[in-house]
Regions:
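Short aromatic-glycine-enriched beta-strand elements
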Residues: 35-40
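Short beta-strand-centered aromatic/proline hotspots
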Residues: 20-30
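A short local loop/turn or secondary-structure capping micro-motif enriched for an aromatic residue
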Residues: 30-33, 60-61
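Structural motif
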Residues: 16-17
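Intrinsically disordered, low-complexity, charged/polar segments
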Residues: 46-63
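Mixed-charge, Lys/Arg-rich low-complexity intrinsically disordered regions
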Residues: 1-12
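Exposed regions on extracellular, virion, or secretory-pathway luminal proteins
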Residues: 1-3, 45-48
Length: 63
């Protein structure tokens, strides 16, 4: 997923590791070398848990 795809996909189904999740948020962080990176907050509908993953690893579900 790209940064520009975050807002249109909030609270929508996305794919991560070949499973469906709900994108519930995104976080911007800075690593120790000063590089900016994004994380996605994904809700696992089956286990009712939240996963924090690399934004690049999330795919939009194109309906």
């Amino acid at each position: 997923m790209e940064i520009k795809e975050i807002i249109p996909n909030l609270n929508r189904t996305v794919i991560y590791n070949d499973s469906e999740y709900t994108l519930t948020g995104s976080t911007v962080r800075k690593d120790v070398q000063g590089r900016i990176f994004y994380q996605a907050e994904l809700l696992d509908k089956n286990k009712n848990s939240v996963c924090i993953v690399r934004l690049e690893d999330v795919k939009c579900l194109n309906l």
